[in-house]
């Protein structure tokens, strides 16, 4: 685990060793309107099978708070770009809680505070490899899986994703929106 960039050899090896079954991604964007708030909590659960003892998830963010692998908390091994996972089984479930940053460059989750109307706007741009700026993932286009997104946001915000809304819960000045699972897609399309 030494670089934010992936080599062709690394991606080929990881594709042979790991098969992703699903992603469940929770984004807490309730603090987005506060210009002094640089980031947000992202919680990702990935189900995958593996033929190797170790692999890594891609993530570019200020901090990884916790990693739970197959029901057990494991030490966080994060080098600023990769979250190391070892002791893998044939079938695995990993949950990563991390802090991601809002972008002002259009990479990842871009936040724009509009001076004309005083409102906050967010949008994502993940091509070619910037989903990892928002949630922990296997950031390779050949490693497709279904995604379920759950977004907590200020009440009154329009929250959109690749699928229709499955559930919406109002929580006073906030809302939580759960979207139906996607078909298997690459991370950069989410």
Walk through the language-model features, giving the residues of each:
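Acidic/His-enriched low-complexity segments
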Residues: 1-190
């Amino acid at each position: 685990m030494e670089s934010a960039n992936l080599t062709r050899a690394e991606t080929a090896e990881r594709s042979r060793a790991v098969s992703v079954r699903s992603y469940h991604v929770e984004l807490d964007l309730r603090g987005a309107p506060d210009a002094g708030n640089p980031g947000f909590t992202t919680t990702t659960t990935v189900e995958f099978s593996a033929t190797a003892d170790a692999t890594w998830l891609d993530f570019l963010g200020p901090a990884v708070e916790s990693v739970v692998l197959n029901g057990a908390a494991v030490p966080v091994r994060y080098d600023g770009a990769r979250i190391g996972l070892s002791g893998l089984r044939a079938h695995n479930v990993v949950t990563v809680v991390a802090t991601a940053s809002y972008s002002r460059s259009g990479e990842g989750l871009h936040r724009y505070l509009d001076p004309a109307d005083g409102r906050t706007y967010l949008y994502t741009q993940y091509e070619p490899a910037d989903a990892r700026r928002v949630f922990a993932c296997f950031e390779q286009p050949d490693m497709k899986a279904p995604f379920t997104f759950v977004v907590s946001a200020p009440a009154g915000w329009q929250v959109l994703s690749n699928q229709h809304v499955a559930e919406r819960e109002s929580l006073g000045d906030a809302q939580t929106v759960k979207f139906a699972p996607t078909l298997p897609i690459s991370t950069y399309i989410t």
